[in-house]
């Protein structure tokens, strides 16, 4: 049973003025929002990753690697100075 789904063909959507009016606003807006999210540092706060200047402290200049999988929680606490 062949038939049509009743949807508009993709070529009609791409050539419509309405599509480009909507997307000429939304695509740059998403780009600007993403740029602001990263450049203001909010991405670091939301995802909990250290900022580039926080990877190495004055006390610890080596890479913070977890080496023992069974005592990883203790290593994380030690590396992040959580007591």
From Swiss-Prot:
It is a single-pass membrane protein. Heme binds at residue 23. Its cofactor is heme b. Keywords: Chloroplast, Electron transport, Heme, Iron, Membrane, Metal-binding, Photosynthesis, Photosystem II, Plastid, Thylakoid, Transmembrane, Transmembrane helix, Transport. Pfam families: Cytochrom_B559 (PF00283), Cytochrom_B559a (PF00284). GO terms for cellular component: chloroplast thylakoid membrane; photosystem II reaction center. The keyword RNA-binding does not apply. SUPFAM superfamilies: Cytochrome b559 subunits. Gene3D superfamilies: Photosystem II cytochrome b559, alpha subunit (1.20.5.860). Signal peptide: none annotated. Heterodimer of an alpha subunit and a beta subunit. PSII is composed of 1 copy each of membrane proteins PsbA, PsbB, PsbC, PsbD, PsbE, PsbF, PsbH, PsbI, PsbJ, PsbK, PsbL, PsbM, PsbT, PsbX, PsbY, PsbZ, Psb30/Ycf12, at least 3 peripheral proteins of the oxygen-evolving complex and a large number of cofactors. It forms dimeric complexes. This is Cytochrome b559 subunit alpha.
């Amino acid at each position: 049973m062949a038939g049509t789904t009743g949807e508009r063909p993709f070529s009609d959507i791409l050539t419509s003025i309405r599509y480009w009016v909507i997307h000429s606003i939304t695509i740059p807006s998403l780009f600007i929002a993403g740029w602001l999210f990263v450049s203001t540092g909010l991405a670091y706060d939301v995802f909990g990753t250290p900022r580039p200047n926080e990877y190495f402290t004055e006390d610890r200049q080596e890479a913070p690697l977890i080496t023992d999988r069974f005592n990883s929680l203790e290593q994380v606490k030690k590396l992040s100075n959580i007591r």
